[in-house]
Every structure is written in C-alpha cells, then in structure tokens.
Amino acid sequence: IQNKDVDLVKIVTGIRRCGKSSLLDLFHQHLLNHGVADSNIIHMNLESLRYRDLKDYLVFYDYVSERIAKSGKTYLIFDELQVIEHWEKAIESFRLDFDVDIYITGSNAYLLSTEFSTLLSGRYVEIRMLPLSFKEFLDFYEFAPDISIEEKFQKYLQFGGMPILREYRFNEARSIQA
C-alpha cells in the first residue's frame, strides 16, 4: 500500500505458496473499500483457462487495453504473469500509454530475469514476501488454550510458516501428512 499510485511497477516475489496471490486479493479489496470503482481494477490470474488465448504479449496488451478505464487511474493486478511470452514489453507499454498502477506476481526466476531488469531498470520495486515468522504464525493460527508454546513451536517447525496451512486444524488429534 505504501507504493500505491507511485509510478513504479510493483513486483511481489516469494517462494511458492507464501501468500502472494492472497496479498493481491487483499489489495484488490482494499482498493474497493477505499472508493476505487470495480471498473477501474483489472485483476487477472493468468493461470486460469479463462485467459488461455493470451499467451502472446501483443494479444495480452490488446485485451487489457480494451478494458482500461477511459477516465481515472486503472489498477492492473496480474497474477502468474510469466505465462505471457515477453510480458515485460506489454507491462512497459501499459506504463507509457495509460494512467495505470501495476502490480504483478509470478515465478521469481522469470520476473526478475536479466531481460526484464534491463527493460524496466529503475521503474519497478520488488515487494518480497516471506513465510510467516514464529510470532506471525502464533498470531495467524488459532490454538486451543491448553497447547503449550513448545507444542506450538513444534507445529511451526513441522509445517512451516505457509498461510495456506490455516486450513488445517492444529488442535485436532489427527495426523497431517505433508
């Protein structure tokens, strides 16, 4: 949120399943809650089959350009952008051609490649996401009051700090196979 409306591409990076997509979903909701019209937000998860025909950056550029709001800033939120070949060319063109604020996630190896770094040098900021720390893990999960701090730490060591694990019930006496 601190880089919102700054003329830099915001690249959310982190290991797989650390919550990058969830962060973008929360940001989308934040925009709506703060008065941004839904028509001024384009949020696409490019792994969805809905976008299967957008693998070429020119087709992708045309598709998105047709949907950019005619007035006011448009927020472009792209998840798993690396599925678009030469996506960095489309992103730079959006920056140049429209009043947009751009947020992207995807595979670290593709997003921070040399070609991309060269094209957008000085025009992007990386937002690194890490798994939850032990303190965040304690704040994030609900444990029964009778579970000791040692047992909670063992759960943290066993399962790590991935937000998806919130779906598991650590209080139940059952084995979770990873």
Residue ranges and their predicted role:
Residues Q2-D7:
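Phosphate-binding P-loop
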Residues V12:
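Hydrophobic anchor at the beta1->P-loop junction of P-loop NTPases
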Residues K20:
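Conserved lysine of the Walker
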Residues L23, F27:
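Hydrophobic positions on the alpha1 helix immediately C-terminal to the Walker A/P-loop
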Residues I42-T74:
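Short glycine-rich substrate-engagement loop in P-loop NTPases that contacts/grips substrate
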Residues I77, D101-S107, R128:
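Structural recognition of the conserved hydrophobic beta-strand(s) that form the central parallel beta-sheet
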Residues Y110-E126, Y141-E142:
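Short regulatory helix/loop adjacent to the ATP-binding pocket of P-loop NTPases
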Residues K135-A178:
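Interdomain hinge/linker elements that couple catalytic modules in large macromolecular machines
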